[in-house]
Amino acid sequence: MNGNRFGRLFEVTTYGESHGPGMGVVVSGCPAGVALDERMIQDELDRRKPGQSMITTSRGEPDEVSIQSGLQDGYTTGTPIGMTIENKDAESGKYEPFVTAPRPSHGDYTYSAKFGTRNWGGGGRSSARETVNWVAAGAVAKAVLAQSDHDVRVKAHVNQIGEIEAPDVSFEDIREHSEDNEVRCADPETAERMRALIDDYQERGDSIGGSIYFEARGVPRGLGAPRFDSVPARLGQALFAIPATTSVEFGLGRDARSVAGKQRNEDWTVADGDEDHVVADEGDPIPAGNDHGGLQGGITTGEPIYGEASWHAPTSIPKTQATVDWETGEEKAVTVTGRHDPSLPPRAVPVVEAMLYCTILDFMLLGGRINPDRLDGHPGQYDTDYHPSSPRNE
């Protein structure tokens, strides 16, 4: 099975299955000299782990990370960083009815059709359990960016559950209030309504979808390459990799289809050097607005990158549904029991942030904004052929 690696210079390779012994991730391309310890990784994993509240799965995984390599005396060495997380509360017995009878709207049959076999416990490799690895990698990327000369900050919050939509909130409000409630919505009144809606679906044995607003600030202009390595193309790939993602938008997103060109086009103006929302020096040209979401021509403008990603309702629900045993051809009525989330966005917030951190850092390394060998080394201008020469360190 391929497709277990992403990133060009900051390369993340993951392994593990939902009900296997554990999960693991290897991060290659992290510069040497970054202060890093297990607590920094654990803080992010604790935001994603199951069993946080009544609106998450009750699976009791502590998600304790163990760093196996890549550190010396609390600093990265530039060698691969290996991290493992044990699975301690798997219950595979409830999945035995689906060994040859696929659960509706899961990857059970498609995996079996492709590979001729699969690990059926908990969905195996197709489970969202896999995202624990991504959050661990994202914590490493976050540490690199925080200790670099660039003030890159990424935040996200749940902005819609079902038909309940939060009003627009500021980046500062998201930073300060997105963790104030179990839904991870930065608007407290909306969060209460969202929580009640999730509870209602859960009590009825059903589930509900939603969306997450994300924003990255401090990203310098000029990152990305045309076409297939554009920033929106790579960010879109990273976010669509999250299980159950149905759409990803930047800037105006789908609303742009009903906006005239003159209205959406943004005039250019001159930076006065005091803007706190854009990376620009005094006298630099900057867009007068940001309906493009910090991206023009697939390349960063220095303005905030923002957008929205949506998820469908979780497919594991205790409702009677129809399936077919692919060995016997028998039609069956099945009920998916077990422990599952009634709505995905509350736990997906740290996953979204992690994928943005990983992808943005990769672009920063490719674009020569951060030395790929050592954090205290001189940046340089590299080609985007993924094999840059090391810069001179004087």
Curated annotation (Swiss-Prot):
KW Glycosyltransferase (keyword) present: no
Catalysed reaction equations from the record: 5-O-(1-carboxyvinyl)-3-phosphoshikimate = chorismate + phosphate
SUPFAM superfamilies cross-referenced by the UniProt entry: Chorismate synthase, AroC (SSF103263)
Record keywords: Amino-acid biosynthesis, Aromatic amino acid biosynthesis, FAD, Flavoprotein, FMN, Lyase, NADP
Cofactor note: Reduced FMN (FMNH(2)).
EC identifiers of the protein: 4.2.3.5
InterPro entries: Chorismate_synth, Chorismate_synth_AroC_sf, Chorismate_synthase_CS
GO CC, any one term: cytosol
GO BP terms, alphabetized: amino acid biosynthetic process; aromatic amino acid family biosynthetic process; chorismate biosynthetic process
Cofactors demanded by this protein: FMNH2
GO molecular-function terms, A-Z: chorismate synthase activity; FMN binding
Family of the protein in this entry: Belongs to the chorismate synthase family.
Main function: This reaction introduces a second double bond into the aromatic ring system.
Protein name: Chorismate synthase
